[in-house]
Regions:
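A glycine-rich dinucleotide-binding beta-alpha-beta segment and adjacent secondary-structure elements
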Residues: 305-371, 399-412, 537-591, 596
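Conserved beta-strand-loop-beta-strand element in the redox core of flavoprotein oxidoreductases
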Residues: 127-143
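Beta1/beta-strand and adjacent pyrophosphate-binding region of the FAD-binding site
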Residues: 2-15
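Extended, charge-enriched "interface" segments that sit outside catalytic cores
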Residues: 429, 446-615, 619-622
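Short hydrophobic core segments
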Residues: 10, 143-154
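An anion/pyrophosphate-binding glycine-rich loop and adjacent beta-alpha core
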Residues: 38, 54, 183-319, 416-502, ...
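Internal hydrophobic alpha-helix adjacent to the cofactor/substrate pocket in enzyme cavities
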Residues: 377-398
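Conserved N-terminal/central alpha/beta ligand/cofactor-binding core
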Residues: 4, 21-125, 140, 152-172, ...
Length: 623
């Protein structure tokens, strides 16, 4: 067997799967090394994909030719579009998935990807020569050689699990940790740290009193994660909600002395936006209840996931506390919740391509960069895989801007600001979120993927056809005139003001009460135009309506983004000796030396860099 590859990806989680698929589909001879081929794409925590901002990332991965969206659609057991009551910039798709099917769907994708080989083993050491990674050695003693390596090891690097005072080595429940790999990297000047995450108890559905819970149903309209998924009705299994109470909190408080988070056993930092139940009761002592979500793990299992009850308290405390909730009075569990500590690497030592600034041709993606979440990992993975291929075969680095994708925001935040806690994406982190909607990820990114070779001709033509149809609908509304006497009765029925004189159709659709769907039956010529749409009709109509209703906001945000682009075009890397620029503040000098930003715009986003510091650099550049 030949153990020489263009690209090797270490770890087959969500980052690793996307990285390996991207590199291989672009033509690189690729090897994906995993400790367990039966855990490829494992959902280590909740059996769900998407959510606020995360759903947008999955759509972006799909638009770039990745697979997370397709795998999710094929294994979904409930779909919802979150934040529908808000504007479309906030709409976020989310799906419950069948955990077991998700793994096997990912495995089928990867096993059928040309240029990709899967190897089951544990990597112990990277081979680094003259500041460049050239290969690796596994625990079986196999030496691999590679032009580029992508590290996507998740929580497995020196992983340590906690339940009460009990500590157990492992990267996930009943799975061994990976040792020595961190040390083989840090000895070359890369900085590592420790972070913590956790997962909740898993429950036997047969022990739950569902009649004491509220149901949470799915939705069955046209929305999906993938732009190329086959249109089909997704299965819609129920989820349920319930609440903790003061009795639950009392039991939890009684166990705090045995909590590894509060007795000093765990020193590392956990995710702020996914706190454990014990953190909730400590930080919000006056809150009488906390909402919990009970989610199915799959179609053919009794196992349920209790979202909102992450805990590393002793098992007996977890069970006793839950039994104080009426619906869980006869509770039976499959396994308790636990916390896990793991190694991560300082992401400010990375380029925007996710290649290390310290070790050439070594890329990092996923939780090893200090992020949390399947979606954040997948987004980093596809970018790392693309750039690893480019490093092997030549080409311009692939970098996504903050106005192009949530993935661009994510990576820029990591490499520019760094992390002091597990990083989770939110819509509030994106300054151009009206430009980064879930409905238009394909129109933002698929052409770039096509030029790379990651998206094929037929998909690109499908995009062009969609864009043409949207343009046709919008242009019709701009030119078609409406007479007041012909439409006023309909407007009154729809709860909006009557016209005093004629107007263009686009002006009517701009009203809050009017949609394309409810106005079209009253405008036969418009209905005729809509009926000409042959494929993806609902998707095209929604996109056209968003463009019409939010044109002013979209144009304004685009103008602001274009102004910032001027700073993005001013390259400063290698132009200054920051240590000797006394006109900069001490903090600015320290931060600029550490981050070594590529552009003036990136410098302006570094915490501690003031507008006056940017003005100093502009003056020195002669601008």
């Amino acid at each position: 067997m030949d153990f020489k590859y263009d690209v090797i990806v270490i770890g087959a989680g969500h980052a690793g799967c996307e990285a390996a698929a991207a590199a291989a589909n672009l033509g690189s001879k690729t090897c994906l090394i995993t400790m367990d081929m039966n855990k490829i794409g494992q959902m280590s925590c909740n059996p769900a994909v998407g959510g606020i901002a995360k759903g947008q990332i999955v759509r972006e991965i799909d638009a770039l030719g990745g697979y997370m969206g397709l795998v999710t659609d094929r294994t979904a057991i409930q779909f919802r579009m979150l934040n529908r009551s808000k504007g479309p910039a906030m709409w976020s798709p989310r799906a419950q998935c069948d955990r077991a099917k998700f793994i096997w769907e990912w495995r089928a994708v990867l096993e059928n990807t040309p240029n990709l080989h899967i190897w089951q083993d544990t990597v112990e050491e990277l081979i680094i020569e003259n500041g460049e990674v050239t290969g690796l050695v596994t625990c079986w003693g196999v030496t691999f050689h590679a032009k580029c390596i992508v590290l996507t090891a998740g929580t497995f690097l020196n992983g340590l699990m906690h339940i009460g005072h009990k500590m157990l080595a492992g990267g996930r429940c009943a799975e061994p940790a990976s040792y020595h790999l961190t040390e083989s990297i840090t000895r070359h000047g890369i900085t590592s740290g420790r972070m913590k995450t956790g997962t909740p108890v898993r429950i036997d559905a047969r022990s739950v009193h569902f009649d004491m819970m509220e149901t949470q149903d799915g939705e069955n309209d046209f929305h999906r994660f993938s732009y190329i998924s086959e249109p089909r009705k997704l299965k819609q299994l129920q989820c349920w909600t319930c609440y903790t109470n003061e009795e639950v909190h009392e039991v939890l408080r009684s166990g705090l002395a045995d909590s590894p988070l509060f007795n000093g056993q765990i020193q590392s930092i956990g995710p702020r936006y996914c706190p454990s139940i014990k953190t909730k009761i400590v930080t919000s002592p006056d809150k009488p209840q906390h909402q919990l979500f009970l989610e199915p793990e799959g179609e053919s299992t009794h196992e349920l996931y209790l979202n909102g009850f992450s805990s590393s308290l002793p098992m007996d405390i977890q069970i006793e506390a839950l039994k104080r909730i009426p619906c869980f009075k006869d509770l039976v569990i499959y396994r308790p919740g636990y916390a896990i500590e793991y190694d991560y690497f300082d992401p400010t030592q990375l380029k925007h391509t996710l290649e290390s600034k310290v070790i050439k041709n070594l890329f990092f993606a996923g939780q090893v960069n200090g992020t949390t979440g399947y979606e954040e990992a997948g987004g980093q993975g596809i970018v790392a895989g693309i750039n690893a291929h480019i490093n092997c075969h030549g080409g311009e680095p692939f970098v996504l801007g903050r106005d192009e994708a949530y993935i661009g925001v994510l990576i820029d935040d990591l490499v520019t600001k760094g992390v002091d806690e597990p990083y989770r994406m939110f819509t509030s982190r994106a300054e151009y979120r009206i430009l980064l909607r879930q409905d238009d990820a394909d129109m933002r990114l698929t052409e770039r993927a096509y030029k790379l070779g990651l998206v094929k001709q037929d998909r690109y033509e499908m995009l062009l056809k969609k864009q043409a149809e949207i343009n046709r609908i919008v242009e019709f509304t701009q030119t078609y005139s409406i007479k007041a006497d012909k439409i006023n009765d309909a407007l009154e029925t729809l709860g909006t003001a009557r016209l005093t004189h004629g107007c263009k159709l686009i002006d009517l659709i701009g009203r809050p009460q009017i949609t394309i769907e409810n106005i079209a039956p009253h405008v036969p010529a418009f209905m005729e135009q809509l009926n000409k749409i042959e494929e993806r009709k609902d998707e095209i109509i929604e996109a056209a309506e968003i463009r019409i209703k939010y044109k002013g906001y979209i144009d304004r945000e685009r103008m602001i983004a274009d102004k910032i682009h001027r700073l993005e075009s001013i390259r400063i890397k290698g132009k200054f000796d920051y240590a000797n620029l006394q006109s900069l503040s001490t903090e600015a000098r320290q931060k600029l030396i550490k981050i070594d930003p590529e552009t003036l715009a990136q410098a302006s986003r570094i915490p501690g860099i003031s507008p006056s510091d940017i003005n100093v650099l502009l003056v020195l550049l002669g601008r």
